[in-house]
């Protein structure tokens, strides 16, 4: 996200975002969901340690969030995402917004000086 989001204050059911949008590497992201909703949902993939037990009649899924984590976890990406989140929290969204506004103004002012560009 490019701004702070209080999922509890907004009573958000689901929130997803890409890690690379907040300086983490590509290939990692976040899905926030209310636990009660995740507990009602079946997984859409199978694999890894998402299955608690298997019998001849079916399978018992692991507890949330593990039942949605099929396959090998991107450990390096998860670590990098956590560090990116800490970095953004450290510098603050206000700093990011101010910097983006300054860069946008600089770009727009520069583009206005190019005769072939009309804004």
Question: How would you describe each model-predicted region?
Answer:
Residues 1-119:
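Pyridoxal 5′-phosphate
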């Amino acid at each position: 996200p490019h701004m702070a989001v209080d999922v509890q204050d907004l009573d958000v059911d689901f929130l997803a975002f890409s890690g690379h949008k907040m300086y983490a590497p590509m290939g990692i992201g976040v899905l926030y969901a209310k636990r009660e909703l995740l507990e009602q949902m079946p997984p859409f993939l199978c694999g890894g340690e998402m299955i608690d037990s298997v019998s001849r009649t079916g399978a018992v899924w692991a507890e949330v969030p593990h039942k949605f984590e099929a396959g090998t976890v991107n450990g390096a990406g998860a670590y990098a995402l956590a560090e990116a989140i800490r970095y953004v929290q450290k510098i603050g969204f206000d700093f990011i917004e101010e910097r983006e506004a300054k860069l946008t103004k600089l770009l727009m002012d520069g583009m206005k000086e190019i005769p072939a560009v009309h804004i």
